[in-house]
């Protein structure tokens, strides 16, 4: 029977299956951070349980950390307590922790791939919705809740139903200056933020085949913004090249065996997909969100839509509501709208290729004195590499602040945030109301 990549990985990890559509899956890698794990560890203590396989669990501090200093008190008392609790929990249960003083510390979805923890064919979970990032390697990866974090810690398994399969094929020649972020925003805009609900999305096409691993991670990172359980891309030579000689990657004779297995991780020719779409990006222009949902997105040369042009009352009301919150008028070009802050960072766009691309645009240029701009590398390793290449100097000379690794202004959980009414051009993945701070406006 022909299978999709998702079905192959799912089926190979089933340890128990009931008569319904539910199975217990073995989990290969469990990633944790300071925000969604404290209650899970407290519950383990209360029930007098241990962590079943601590060597398959890795922790980092990212959501709450200050990117201005390594002081865990800098982001407030709640953040301090969560980080102190993570240190305590990892010490007690013998879990590897990348804390703020570790040179490899960074955003969980940046450090796991760059260290080779993320491998094709794995099942990977984390108490974070953008765990779908790791699907770029052909790994079944998805976010889980705190009660599920506890279950994985205690059993190294997770109860999961089988999701449907969606195939998205991207065709056309990629226009100059168009990035993976533009492509995924365009797809979300075309298909909607709920089209992927109940599905695992696999991406296909020559556009995908020619993408670097960092571009593929951006694509899969935002599959969740379509409502999908996860995003997947089959591993290939680009994947193998990226993973070779990483700290946690197989080596020696195990490397060849790994390649032999990884080469089987692709959807069969006649595999059945419940839904499929073909997206042509030949004429794609740079994309930017104007509203409060990732599917409220337009090309940079388009106007904010007029609600009267839509038949659906839901869409009309959504446009009016979003414009009111964002302080925008329908029919406006976003190129005519000024911003207060600029943020380059997040698990979507804080890798070395992202920083190289941004630095090329900023070289020998200066930002407005009225704009505060920050660059936050996704990890200590990214920061170190960028500084070796002199990228930090380009950003600083342009007027940006060069920061320490962390989630930073992607979300208002640390001391990098928008003030009420401030507008930000952001490289992050969500433009929800208040995402970057109460009353903040995100593009």
Swiss-Prot record:
Pathway: Amino-acid biosynthesis; L-leucine biosynthesis; L-leucine from 3-methyl-2-oxobutanoate: step 2/4. It catalyses: (2R,3S)-3-isopropylmalate = (2S)-2-isopropylmalate. Its EC number is 4.2.1.33. [4Fe-4S] cluster binds at residues 347, 407, 410. SUPFAM superfamilies: Aconitase iron-sulfur domain (SSF53732). Its cofactor is [4Fe-4S] cluster. CDD domains: IPMI. GO terms for biological process: L-leucine biosynthetic process. Heterodimer of LeuC and LeuD. Catalyzes the isomerization between 2-isopropylmalate and 3-isopropylmalate, via the formation of 2-isopropylmaleate. Belongs to the aconitase/IPM isomerase family. LeuC type 1 subfamily. This is 3-isopropylmalate dehydratase large subunit. It comes from Buchnera aphidicola subsp. Uroleucon erigeronensis. The gene is leuC.
């Amino acid at each position: 029977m022909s299978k999709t990549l998702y079905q192959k990985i799912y089926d190979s990890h089933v340890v128990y299956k009931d008569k319904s559509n539910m199975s217990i899956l073995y989990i290969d890698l469990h990633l944790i951070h300071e925000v969604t794990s404290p209650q899970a560890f407290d519950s383990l203590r209360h029930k007098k349980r241990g962590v079943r396989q601590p060597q398959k669990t890795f922790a980092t501090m990212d959501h709450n950390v200050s990117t201005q200093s390594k002081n865990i008190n800098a982001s407030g008392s709640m953040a301090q307590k969560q980080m102190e609790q993570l240190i305590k929990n990892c010490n007690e249960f013998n879990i590897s922790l990348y804390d703020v003083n570790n040179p490899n510390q960074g955003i969980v979805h940046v450090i796991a791939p760059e260290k080779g923890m993320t491998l094709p064919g794995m099942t990977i979970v984390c108490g974070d919705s953008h765990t779908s990032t790791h699907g770029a390697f052909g790994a079944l990866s998805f976010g889980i809740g705190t009660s599920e974090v506890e279950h994985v810690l205690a059993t190294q398994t997770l109860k999961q139903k089988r999701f449907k399969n969606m195939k998205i094929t991207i065709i056309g020649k990629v226009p100059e200056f168009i990035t993976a972020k533009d492509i995924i925003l365009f797809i979300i805009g075309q298909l909607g933020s709920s089209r992927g609900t109940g599905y695992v999305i696999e991406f296909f096409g020559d556009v995908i085949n020619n993408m670097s691993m960092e571009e593929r991670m951006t694509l899969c990172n935002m599959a969740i913004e379509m409502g999908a359980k996860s995003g997947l891309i089959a591993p290939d030579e680009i994947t193998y090249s990226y993973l070779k000689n990483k700290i946690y990657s197989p080596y020696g004779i195990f490397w060849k065996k790994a390649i032999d297995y990884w080469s089987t991780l692709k959807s069969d020719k006649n595999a059945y997909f419940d839904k499929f779409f073909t997206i042509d990006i030949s004429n794609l222009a740079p994309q930017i969100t104007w509203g409060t949902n990732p599917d409220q997105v337009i090309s940079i040369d388009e106007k904010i839509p007029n609600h009267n042009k839509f038949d659906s009352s839901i869409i009309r009301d959504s446009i009016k509501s979003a414009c009111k919150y964002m302080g925008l008028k329908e029919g406006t070009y976003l190129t005519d709208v000024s911003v207060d802050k600029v943020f380059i960072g997040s698990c979507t766009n804080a890798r070395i290729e992202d920083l190289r691309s941004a630095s090329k645009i900023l070289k020998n240029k200066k930002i407005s004195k009225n704009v505060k701009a920050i660059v936050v590398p996704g990890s200590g390793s990214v920061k170190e590499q960028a500084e070796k290449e002199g990228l930090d100097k380009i950003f600083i000379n342009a007027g940006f602040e060069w920061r320490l690794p962390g989630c930073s202004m992607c979300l208002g959980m640390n001391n990098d945030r928008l003030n009420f009414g401030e507008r930000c051009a952001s490289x992050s993945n969500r433009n929800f109301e208040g995402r970057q701070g109460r009353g903040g406006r995100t593009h």
